[in-house]
Amino acid sequence: MPVPFDSQKIYYRTPFGAVEEGTTIHLRILLPRDLHTQRADLAVKYDYDYNWEYFGFFWCGTFDDATEIWEADFTPNKIGLYWYGFKLQTKYGLRYIVPSDPYNISTIETSPGRSWQLTCYKKGFTTPKWPVGGVMYQILPDRFNFSGEEKNLTRTDFQRNTDWYALPQWWPNENGEITNSDFFMGDLKGITQKLDYLEELGVSCIYLNPISEAYSNHRYDTGDYSKVDPILGTNEDFINLCAEAKKRGIHVINDGVYSHTGSDSKYFNRNGRYGENTGAYRDQNSPYYSWYKFNNWPNDYHSWWGFYTLPEVNETDPKFNEYINGKDGIVRTYMRYGNSGWRLDVADELPDEFMENLRKAVKEEDPEGFIVGEVWEDASNKESYGARRKFLLGEELDSVMNYVFRNAILDFCRGADAKYVMNQIMSVIENYPRPVLRVLMNSLSTHDTERALTVIAGEPLNGRDRQWQANQKLSYDQRKRGTALLKLAVGMQYTLPGFPCVYYGDEAGLEGYRDPFNRCCYPWGREAVSYTHLTLPTILLV
């Protein structure tokens, strides 16, 4: 007998997947004739609502001698998530059609269970056209290329690593702290020098990890949003990078770090670098004081995941919101420099109101501006801080970092069951709005994950420490096997819906476990040439 319902087949549900508000959905269920169903109802509720609404099915004939067909329509008129299921009144009492694990195949049960998700997004929601069919390339600026230009730096509290091919400093200092203060001096002019290389690879978008002034080499501890870090160059260097990239048909997007700043910043100024009596830590009359959440000023304050160097900001503070999203704020200023959009760090920690304001700022400057959020799970039904998030409903993000696809692809390459992998992929395709699917940021590696080659071919990390990670290197046989499997992974990456993203150096055979081993410098002149085709859309022809 056929299954009663399958939400991923258009025989049972049209249209497939997420829908615009006001779209009528036609549903069909198949029921055993010997169940003697007297009435069938579609049960629907809006997200967190407690009350279910019921819509009657009509009997529409028989599928075969043992199966009958029932059909109904439903029209969601409000954006958000809906949950639906099926209630049957039969000769034998109440029965329910419910999704059953592990592959979403439905069964008829005597009690209600899980429901199916329906995503309803804003009518007219569109996403930028330019990412479609292109390739994104992620660059950690300190580690991609050094232009050779020496900077006139006033800062002295950092370590310059003169061996481009060395491991980043991974051991703690004498105080037991990891300071991330070793720099390889990669810069914006160095990226500009390599634009021809990126164009040749087929890159259409560069995603830059943070470039604003900061203490650390990763620059997620912003010191001054308005200035490019002097080690990277100047604001003019960024303007020139965007202009030169545009000549080659390449867009540039920046990393927006707006859930926290650095403690060593002009805004907080714990260390006094920006003056003796400035910043929220040193002056309660500071214009930035209201940005932060002090329990007991100055030393007891909210910080990101307990890191005292990353004080959290109150994103709903009017002064902070104006500074970032205002008419002359940071978002618009960089868009005017030539920036084509933003990747938002820890998007699940940014309030809806803030992201709505940011979207308005971006789209007013450039209707084709691209906004990507860092979300590790299914972003359509993500909850954070006790609330359902509205990332993909047409009022906040255009796209998210698609870690669900990444995990599924790499799991498959490591031998995971194909049905399980397919279910992970199809759940995203079913739950995400079509405008989002076409621009999903599909990465196999990022600055926050192990390199794809290491995941596929190396020993599992299994919580091993940095000492162990520092001493690992793939053997010849591991690398050979990893090459073949990486081709498979990239083939999937390029053929699934979305905007494939290459993490710098993956195409050159870089390996590495967790930070900082996944952040080594691009191996110019030492590339593993068998990998250089991996960013090309012709991967399946190789």
Write out the residue ranges for each language-model feature.
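Aromatic- and glycine-rich beta-strand/loop motifs that create alpha-glucan
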Residues: 33-78, 89-102
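Hydrophobic faces of well-ordered beta-strands that scaffold small-molecule active sites
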Residues: 135-137, 206-208, 252-254, 342, ...
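Conserved small/polar residues in nucleotide/adenosyl-binding loops
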Residues: 532-538
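Aromatic/acidic polysaccharide-binding cleft in carbohydrate-active enzymes
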Residues: 443-471, 490, 497-529
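Non-catalytic, glycine-rich low-complexity segments
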Residues: 1-35, 109-110, 115-129
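Conserved, mostly hydrophobic/aromatic
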Residues: 29, 139, 198, 225, ...
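Substrate-binding/active-site clefts of carbohydrate-active enzymes
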Residues: 140-205, 211-337, 358-364
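Active-site-proximal helices and loops of the catalytic beta/alpha 8
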Residues: 242-251, 259-260, 265-276, 330, ...
